[in-house]
Amino acid sequence: MGKEKFDRSKPHVNVGTIGHVDHGKTTLTAAISAVLAKSQGKAATKFDQIDGAPEERERGITIATAHIEYETDKRHYAHVDCPGHADYVKNMITGAAQMDGAILVVSATDGPMPQTREHILLSRQVGVPFIVVFMNKVDMVDDEELLELVEMEIRELLSEYDFPGDDLPVIQGSALGALNGEAKWEEKIMELMNAVDEYIPEPTRDTEKDFMMPVEDVFSITGRGTVATGRVERGVLKVNDEVEIVGLHEETKKSVCTGVEMFRKLLDYAEAGDNIGALLRGVSRDDIERGQVLAKPNTITPHKTFKAQVYILSKEEGGRHTPFFGNYRPQFYFRTTDVTGMCQLPEGTEMVMPGDNIELTVELIAPIALEKETRFSIREGGRTVGAGSVTEIVE
């Protein structure tokens, strides 16, 4: 069978299912695929294809995630679903699968459970901007009032974490019913996808954001100047654009990009995803180093102290075998370099166990170009022991 051509005419949006174990996230994922495929006369992704998720490595951490794709009339979706709770935590903290919005699955028979709360908190902390709710298993609840109560409880929980609980869409249905081809439940899946189409806005694409490139390597070309190489993380860099060199030193240097090279060819501009060399005017070989970033002026600043949501690897995952305490000093790996930092634990927390997910305050020994949602790994002697996402800049 020939490969289907990727349709670029429809806007592309990344979503994922979140929620408590056994509330039906994977069944819903399969149901969405089945119902949409049926409506378009295509083949669906089966439940066991999603459940037997392959393992991936992101920032030195192994995460099991299933990626499937489907489309509505308006959009093309990439959907991520994780088999285990720890996989969700790791996925969200490492940003392995960035979500433009999430579908929160809550069983009508249980209502919100501990992981429901944890996934909502994580969504808030790591910047999942929009949540649509699917109340699952409503075919197992006869009491209309009970359904109303559960919906109220979900909305209140979302509001507690600063999501617009009163206004966001809540669809009541049965994922299993839809998967089994029952028309009334299939209808609810279409209603859910309609809500996702309408409520989750199209994301700002990486090329539309402000230019930023982590510096991987630096070398000088006699008679031409200094070249910084790296992969453009976001935005566009045009020849003759002004740039700033940010991080590792208190003061930020300015320069002008006088040339952009890719695969030994000269370009007029580079955009997000390109691996390039940027020729910088008036910059000596010692003014710039790996670990800094090139950025559009006044868009990112160097910081030493921040709060972060982190996941600490369990012993089984190759992490630490013992807990750590306050004043723990590992290395924090940001983009292309390690910087030592000191950890402060939240008030009332004595120690952090391998396998924990917690908010830490970190003070680095050198400033790094940071902003909310910057991802990093935590390492000890080159071995990854955790991962995190910046939730707040302190100074």
Curated annotation (Swiss-Prot):
The domain of life is Bacteria
Q: Where is the tr-type G domain?
A: 10-204
SUPFAM superfamilies reported for this sequence = EF-Tu/eEF-1alpha/eIF2-gamma C-terminal domain, P-loop containing nucleoside triphosphate hydrolases, Translation proteins
The residues that the entry says bind Mg(2+) are T26
Mainly localized where? cytoplasm
Location within or outside the cell: Cytoplasm
Query: Per the record, which residues fall in region G3?
Result: 81-84
This chain's protein is named Elongation factor Tu
Q: Which organism is it from?
A: Exiguobacterium sibiricum (strain DSM 17290 / CCUG 55495 / CIP 109462 / JCM 13490 / 255-15)
What lineage, starting at the top, does this entry show? Bacteria, Bacillati, Bacillota, Bacilli, Bacillales
State the encoding gene.
tuf
